[in-house]
Amino acid sequence: MKYIYNFLLMIQFLTRIPVKRSLPCEKEDFRRGAAMLPLIGLIVGCIQWVVFYILSKIFPANITAIFIILVGMVLIGGLHQDGLGDIFDGFFSFKGDKEKIIEIMKDSRVGTFAVLALIFDILIKYSALSFIIENNMSYAIIITPIMSRCTLVFLFLIGKNAKKNGTGNLFIENVSVKEFIISFIFMIVPSVLLIGYKYSVIIIVVSFIITLAFLNLCNRKIGGITGDCLGANNEIVEMFTMLVFVALLYIN
C-alpha cells in the first residue's frame, strides 16, 4: 500500500493531475516514489498520445504537434521548462562563482538566455513531432517522457546536491541502485513493447550520454545539481530523444 501512496505522491508533486488526498511526505516516501517516475512519464505520454489520436483525425500534423506540446506543459505546470530557462540564464548569462550562478537561477525574472532556450525547446519539439506524426511513429510520443524521467532517477543516484536546501534535495542523493533498477524496468518494458529492442537501445544510449554530459556541465558550473538542473535535463533529453526518432525515421 505504501508504494501506491508514494506513486500518488509523485503524481501530486510533479503534475497538475488532481490527487485530493493527504499523503505522507517524508524523505523515505520521495525515495521510494522516485522509482515511479517513468510511470509518471507513461501517464503524461499516454495523455499526449490520446490528444494526438483525436486531433490527427481533424487537423494536419503541425497543428496536432502544437497541442501535444501544450498539453504536456499543462500537465506538469511548466515545471521542467522553468528549470530549463533558469539553467540557461544562470549558466550562460554570467561567468563567475557558484553562489552567483545559483542566485541568478533563483531569480524569478526571465532573462534573454532563458527565452532563447525555451524558444529552441518548443521549436525542436514542434518540428520533431510534426515529422514523427507524418511518418506514423506516434508511439514516440509515449516513449519520450518515459525515457526522460528515467534519466532523472539516474541523476538522483549519481549526482550530488549543489545547494544545502531546495526541492531537488528531496530526490538528489536520496535513491539507491534498487530504485534506479526499478525505474529502468518501468522504462525498458514499454519501450521494447512499443518501438522494439533496436530502437530502444539506441534511444537509451543517447539519452544517458546526454544526461552524463549535462551532469558534467552542472558539476563544472555549480559543483552539483539542483531541482532546476533536473527540469532542464528532462527537457534536453526529450529534445534529443525526439531528434533520434526523427533521424532513425529519416535514415530508414
Curated annotation (Swiss-Prot):
- State where it is primarily located: membrane
Q: Matching InterPro entries, A to Z? A: CobS
Q: Does the keyword Nucleotide-binding apply?
A: no
Annotated membrane topology: Multi-pass membrane protein
Essential cofactor(s): Mg(2+)
Its pathway is: Cofactor biosynthesis; adenosylcobalamin biosynthesis; adenosylcobalamin from cob(II)yrinate a,c-diamide: step 7/7
| EC numbers on record | 2.7.8.26
Question: Which residues does UniProt assign to the signal peptide?
Answer: none
Q: Report the GO molecular function annotations.
A: adenosylcobinamide-GDP ribazoletransferase activity; cobalamin 5'-phosphate synthase activity
Quick one: a GO cellular component term?
plasma membrane
Name the UniProt key words of this record, in alphabetical order. Answer: Cell membrane, Cobalamin biosynthesis, Magnesium, Membrane, Transferase, Transmembrane, Transmembrane helix
Q: Where in the cell is it found?
A: Cell membrane
Name this protein carries in UniProt: Adenosylcobinamide-GDP ribazoletransferase
